[in-house]
Amino acid sequence: MRFLDGHQPRFDLTYKDVFIVPHRSDVASRFDVDLSTYDGSGTTIPVVVANMTTVAGQRMAETVARRGGLVILPQDLPIATVQQAVEFVKSRDLVIDTPVLLTPNDSVSDATTLIHKRAHGVAVVAFEGRPIGLVRESSCLGVDRFTRVRDVATTDFVTAPVGTDPRKIFDLLEHAPIDVAVLTNADGTLAGVLTRTGAIRAGIYTPATDARGRLRIGAAVGINGDVAGKAQSLAEAGVDVLVVDTAHGYQVKTLEAIKCVASLNLGVPLVAGNVVSAEGTRELLNAGATIVKVGVGPGAMCTTRMMTGVGRPQFSAVLECASAARKLNRHVWADGGVRHPRDVALALAAGASNVMIGSWFAGTYESPGDLMRDRHDQPYKESYGMASKRAVVARTVADSSFDRARKALFDEGISTSRMGLDPDHGGVEDLIDHITSGVRSTCTYVGASTLAELHEKAVVGVQSAAGFAEGHPLPSGW
């Protein structure tokens, strides 16, 4: 990457401050762009879901990995919970989705609670493991909530044997009353579901898989307590990427934790952070990290900069840290501060190999929280920062009440936030489509067919606030 006309900014820059200049291109189509990353994480799109309690869970991990990304489970989860999540994700199919499952005797109330755990919008009613009907939310309207789902389920739905080509599934669903096909095993038992859009995505995305062809998943460990023991347990549970995570990565305690984990030779990429300087990047890499997380304070739920004055504008931080890592043949992840697909593209242009996304994905069906509605009946999910009082209380549950109360005084994050869902595009896959479409287009404008070429060829300019505002669409006129 280079700056336009050799310009050297006199101050640090955020994503809003910069733009990418179009270049002569021989990349004819967005589908000619390879979004696979090159940092050993195994991602085939440059998207990593941040280790936030309100974002990263097993449903999110399954869905994102199927599209080529990676989810990092939070450090606060008990080892047993992580083990369960890893086993679940690695047992999932690479093409078809896990269904929301009901029995004939479940109630309409059960159905309305569970349907929105997945973006495909239906629940499968199964008896003795065999699908007998589908329930949509519309089927439950105007019905007593104690009504049995067998009385509202439709039996008019498409079925196909597992292994059916996704293109054929797409064709079967073209005139179907419900846009979901139910896939069955040879014995007639339920295998999963696939929508028309899912069938299309199966031909666009390449799942992020391990050496045994199973979906990938990562997990985080903090710098307190038995770091080595937990890291060892996470590796034994089968995680594919391990993250040593703390808000201030450039401290002695973090360096000691990295050295401790690196000495275990666990055989998985070791990510560590967070830092915002070349010096901090070098120290973490020299301690044993293979990838460094960059970002202090850019996240939507983070109040660190306003509380402490500490941090750095994210684009400049990524640019400097990526340059330092490259000299050691290592990599960085840009963590936080992305609000639009352009921000992801700019982080990649600056040299990040992956971009971590948190709050943006909190408002999706696949995030762990329950779907709620505001007084205007708009759907939303709650989110909070991982250094907030709410997160601190959850993290210190084993401490004495006095210690918990004392630690709760020192929070740096939003404890309650509402992340709205778009009812028509509420799935994380919709956001992944949105992001990767933007990044692919960026590559065609730059003349890059890979992410490495994007960084190599990108020419970045600095703009005014008015320049950034000019780029916003005006759907309602002016």
Curated annotation (Swiss-Prot):
Source taxon at top rank: Bacteria
Pathway(s) served: Purine metabolism; IMP biosynthesis via salvage pathway
Gene3D superfamilies tied to this protein: Aldolase class I
GO biological process terms held by the UniProt record: IMP salvage; purine ribonucleoside salvage
One cellular component (GO) term of this entry: cytosol
Required co-factors: a monovalent cation
Domain (CBS): residue spans on this chain: 95-152, 153-211
UniProt keyword annotation of Coiled coil present: no
Keyword Repeat applies: yes
EC number annotated for this UniProt entry: 1.7.1.7
This protein's UniProt keywords: CBS domain, NADP, Oxidoreductase, Purine salvage, Repeat
PROSITE patterns to which the protein is assigned, alphabetical: CBS
Leading EC class: oxidoreductase
Catalysis performed (reactions): IMP + NH4(+) + NADP(+) = GMP + NADPH + 2 H(+)
Active site: C302
Single GO MF descriptor: IMP dehydrogenase activity
InterPro entries per record: Aldolase_TIM, CBS_dom, CBS_dom_sf, GMP_reductase, GUAB1, IMP_DH, IMP_DH_GMPRt
Binding positions for NADP(+) per the UniProt entry: D245, T246, A247, G295, V296, G297
Family label: Belongs to the IMPDH/GMPR family. GuaB1 subfamily.
Biological role stated in the UniProt entry: Involved in the purine-salvage pathway. Catalyzes the NADPH-dependent conversion of GMP to IMP.
The protein's name: GMP reductase
Organism: Mycobacterium leprae (strain TN)
Lineage: Bacteria, Bacillati, Actinomycetota, Actinomycetes, Mycobacteriales
Gene: guaB1
